[in-house]
Amino acid sequence: MIGKCKAIAHGSTALDYIFREGKLGYRLAFHNLCSREPKAIYEEMKVVSDYNSRCRNKFLRIEIGIAPQDEKKLPVSELMRIAHLFAKRMGLDNHQWVAVTHKDTDNRHIHIIANRISLYRGI
């Protein structure tokens, strides 16, 4: 597996991208979120991120690539576990994040969009 992470300012665009019809595979996790649709998720995250006015790039865009030889061996439950474990090790327990898979390429991958601002207002 290979993970990539970047701080971004355009959380709404990133959420629209990961939920785009034709790309979306499985909805793996919604952490510290009530909403399930991209626009509502963004609004929910924005309420929390607005507490920190100094941070510019308030969202994290994370992609976890699954090795081709492992794709067939990993059921959805294992992909969920991977997403939760990755987020935990990134220190995102007190943050809002959503994880999905994409099916638009030959290689399965997980996308996570996370709020950099925690529920307790820290980064």
How should each PLM-predicted stretch be described?
Residues 1-123:
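N-terminal nicking endonuclease/strand-transfer module with a His-rich metal-binding environment
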